Amino acid sequence: LQERNPEIVLDPMCGSGTFIIEALMILTDRAPGLVRRFGFNGWHGHDRELWLSLKAEAAERHEKALEQPLPKFYAYDADWEAVKATRENIIAAGFEKLLGDIQIEERTLADWPDFGAENKTAFIVTNPPYGERLGDKASNRSLY
């Protein structure tokens, strides 16, 4: 994703926002464990100073990456509850400051806006509904 340097990142069936959050983490160089607590912190053989040094280095890389221009993010879903969950999960993941760079909307696949994406590099990723989320045959005709 970083090597492709997309101008647009789109998830047209964003569900709870996992792919958008992962893309944000990749493009802002945020280490996956940066905001987590780990059990090894209580281990007697744990080198606390080394761990804090590594975390500080990772945090510095993340802050530096946040200063760089990011693509425009689009997170769409036909289900309002999914849209709401995406917004909440982006905030919970620590990316509240970037909400202005993410268009999160209730939209169907047939209702895409004009992104002005002509001659732009776009990264499109999604996880289409399956299993219980799939729905009935009639409602899926337009999806598949």
Q: Where are each of the predicted segments found?
A:
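Short loop/turn elements that form and flank the Walker-type P-loop nucleotide-binding site
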Residues: 69-70, 118-120
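Hydrophobic alpha-helix-in-membranes signature
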Residues: 11, 127-128
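A short, flexible beta-alpha/helix-coil linker loop
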Residues: 130-133
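Glycine-rich S-adenosyl-L-methionine
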Residues: 135-144
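Conserved S-adenosyl-L-methionine
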Residues: 1-111
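Short SAM/SAH-binding signature in class I
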Residues: 120-127
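Short conserved loop adjoining the S-adenosyl-L-methionine
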Residues: 111-118
